[in-house]
């Protein structure tokens, strides 16, 4: 990838990175426009200033880097993370919106095969999930075979599960262990998510690799009752 690498040690690139993190736009502009520091320079982990602006939620800095400096929102660090992945993982809704407006790829995949949709779903951020789906995010599986709806079911966010299902997530998708979202929600005793999945037609009879159905996964008597009732 293009760009100058920098490491800690008091260089101007180090200064740029620190100013980006704390949102000091005037200092960022001075280093780039007057002192010759490249706006797309990289640290030892291949992260650009835009990665850090995204991770820290520094909107004005990110806007400047993309608008004035033409920094790409789709540059990968050494783990395959883009600024959008960083912003999503950190839960910065307005940053996610800005990056998408500047053409960030909602289906970017990191080294764990996780997309921004996985991270938003893991954190139960239905607002960010909605933004990503509206901009064309797909329900893909990561390296554990988990789709975003598995992550949302683990988190326990009904709103996120509902939005993913509206976005055509496969309610009976299985991960590498053979678990469906219903298995996951039952295992974590998320009663509301279990009820939501059941109402949307989740299959209660699917067995995972341990030959367990969702009802076998839960220690909650309420969940066991719900599943039994929906099986009738």
Swiss-Prot record:
Signal peptide: none annotated. Pfam families: Ank_2 (PF12796). Keywords: ANK repeat, Chaperone, Repeat. ANK repeats lie at residues 45-75, 79-108, 112-141, 144-173, 177-206, 210-232. It comes from the Eukaryota. The keyword Ligase does not apply. InterPro entries: Ankyrin_rpt, Ankyrin_rpt-contain_sf. Acts as a chaperone during the assembly of the 26S proteasome, specifically of the 19S regulatory complex (RC). This is 26S proteasome non-ATPase regulatory subunit 10. It comes from Dictyostelium discoideum (Social amoeba). The lineage of its organism: Eukaryota, Amoebozoa, Evosea, Eumycetozoa, Dictyostelia.
């Amino acid at each position: 990838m293009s760009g100058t690498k920098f490491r800690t040690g008091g260089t101007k690139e180090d200064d740029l990175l620190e100013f980006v993190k704390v949102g000091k736009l005037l200092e960022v502009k001075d280093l780039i426009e007057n002192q010759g520091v490249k706006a797309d320079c990289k640290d030892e982990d291949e992260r650009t200033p835009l990665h850090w602006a995204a991770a820290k939620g520094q909107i004005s800095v990110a806007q400047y880097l993309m608008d004035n400096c033409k920094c790409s929102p789709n540059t990968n660090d050494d783990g395959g993370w883009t600024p959008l992945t960083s912003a999503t993982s950190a839960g910065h809704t307005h940053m996610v919106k800005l990056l998408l407006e500047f053409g960030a790829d909602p289906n970017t995949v990191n080294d764990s095969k996780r997309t921004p949709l996985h991270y938003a779903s893991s954190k139960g951020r239905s607002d960010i999930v909605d933004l990503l789906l509206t901009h064309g995010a797909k329900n893909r599986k990561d390296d554990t075979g988990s789709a975003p709806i598995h992550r949302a079911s683990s988190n326990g966010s009904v709103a996120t599960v509902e939005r993913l299902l509206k976005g055509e997530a496969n309610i009976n998708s299985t991960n590498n262990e053979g678990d469906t979202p219903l298995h996951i929600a039952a295992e974590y005793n998320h009663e509301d998510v279990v009820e939501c999945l059941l109402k949307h037609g989740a299959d209660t009879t699917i067995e995972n690799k341990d030959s367990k159905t969702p009802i076998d996964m839960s220690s909650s008597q309420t969940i066991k009752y719900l599943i039994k009732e929906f099986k009738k």
